[in-house]
Amino acid sequence: MGVVMTNDEQWIKTTCPRDCYDGCGIIVHKRNGEIFKVKGNRDHPSTRGPLCAKCAVSYNGVWLDENARLLYPLRRSGNKGGGEFERISWDEALAEIAQRFVDIDHQYGADRIYHTHYTGTCSVIAGKFPKRFFDHIGATEVDPDTICNAAGHAALSYVFGDSVSGFDPRTSKDSECILIWGANPAHCGPHVHEHWLREHDAKVIVIDPVRTETAASADLHLQVRPGADAALAFAMLHVIRRDALVDENYIKDHVQGYEEVLPSIECCTPEWGKAETGIPATLIEQAARLYARGPSLLWLGQGLQRQPRGGNVFRACAMLPALTGNIGKPGAGFYYLNDTIGIGGRGGGAPGYEKPRFNGGPPPVSQMDIPDLLQAPAAIRSYVVWNCNPLASNPNQALMRQGLAREELFTVVIDCFMTDTADYADIVLPAASFLEFDDVCSSYFHLTIGAQVQCRKPMGESLPNQEIFRRLARAMRFQESTLYEDDRSIIERTLRASGVRETWQELTEQGWAHVADEPLILWAEGRFATPSGRIEIASERAEADGLPRLPQATADAEPVDGKLRLISPAAKWLMNSSFGNDHRVIKMMGPATVTCHPETASDLGIGNGDRVRLSNELGELVLTLRVSDMITPGALLVYKSRWLKSEPDRANVNVLCVARKTDMGESTSVHATEVTVSRID
């Protein structure tokens, strides 16, 4: 089973299931039956050496620490939020949950049971199987993508009919330009940044309001004013049109709506772009020409669409490959996320989640609605949290805390650790870690499938997510066979669906497999999953949904009344909120800070090292100021996802973030938060 043994030592190949572009291979070194070291697989095409710093620390820290892990089912014994619990048996825990669900169903309806989840683990079974249970009972799902990337998915679906079939990264060997817009792989895909981005000779352009490590290493950095991305896309398109760099033949054969949007493009000169975006006109021209000449890859980051008109931004940016023909040929393409299993299977999907056996059921709700819904006893009677930590990750943190404190709200949290959210639970169930059960992982960047191999027995009485919900289904005496499908069956079906030739045995021995031997050229046939079969710049579906027919050349208005725009991207040492409880990670992060530009600091009369208060209508946060030109003037930078219980004020940046929806997808517009700043004397 992919295990190398010598005397009392073993080396096991497995895969990192974190929410990361890398999809790294891991070697687990065991000595005398115990895990001695978790390290990177040097033979893996993404990892090529050590793990990233955060995984290297945490996987050899809290993930192996029995004092940090949840080991047994727990029942609340004190006030909500106090973290006081008593140990109970699995039978007691499951019986209580089952009875409460039955009571809620009879009295209020099963749609009053809400379950929320996201990417605490991205492995196929643990990340998807529990949905079978909730769909079976008719519970309401909190749409996971609305905390992250739903606006981008909605926008690209209007344009291309698909948002998860990007480029194969291996095609970069034929690229002349790689444009990364609103992504920072140095933090969110460290091995992509270290290896892939520089392994060929393509020029790298980064568009980001922050001079990230990725931006600092690029050939060109366009430091756009937050909220002005659509305007920048139109200004670049103006240059491309003016300089005769559009691909007229590709447009004729594959694009709908070019003539309609052309008048807007012709108005958006580079000088206009400078006024809207803060980027010099010459730099706009340089980037536009470099991209248009191609072959070029366009990477649209998830952070880019976390703004009020994030969907419109994506529709505007999507015109770049459409109008230059940088799609469907070697070295060219666009990327948001890759459904690697679907791409490998040429349109299939991962079997971990099966569509419910019945039609209908309650529609999902947006994460942006949850802070308010939690205040309403008539709306939510039970809140089940798995694979996420919403108290740390959701906006409107104070309202989230207030809702979770409701005594009559029956809250169940399933996790490896006692998170901030778990402190408010009535029942806490211990989840097994990725080192403790078999599963399948797929990278959402590299088109690779990885074996997640059990390296040790689950700690204490912890169980994999899927086994927890099999047992809960049994406690509720359900008969539906899909609720009990075993892991090996799902693994084998997943491998077949992905198109890889390897068996599970072979995959564990190698550790990983590409879904295709040679680089795939996606969209090479020029047929798109839109109603017209073409790239739809002009979208009748968008129009029918109450949205503009065309992308708009807009920029957000700058804040007024002394307010500043706050952006809160991913931190180097955290993966969302994962790893936020590791004491070495906490030490490496240091105290939370806020960064502003020197011009902004001068205008406000504040200086480097000052203690400052960030305030708005939702709350306040006291932080130490860093003054740096890494952020554009008029904006503030605070990294997201610190655990509240590790912070002096028991709050992170989400105490300031408004649960405001994007223009499409009902997603988060967290990067449009506005605050005032004052020095604490």
Give the positions of each predicted feature.
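Active-site phosphate/pyrophosphate-binding segments
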Residues: 236, 256-370
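Extended redox/cofactor-interaction regions of prokaryotic respiratory oxidoreductases
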Residues: 128-197, 202-207, 214, 230-234, ...
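Long, contiguous, secondary-structure-rich segments that constitute the structural scaffold
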Residues: 459, 464-513, 582-595, 599-681
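Short beta-alpha connecting loops at secondary-structure transitions
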Residues: 216-224, 447-459
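N-terminal export/assembly segments and adjacent metallocofactor-ligating motifs
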Residues: 1-245, 267, 280-281, 472, ...
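Conserved short loop/turn motifs at secondary-structure junctions
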Residues: 114-122, 276-279, 301-308, 388-391
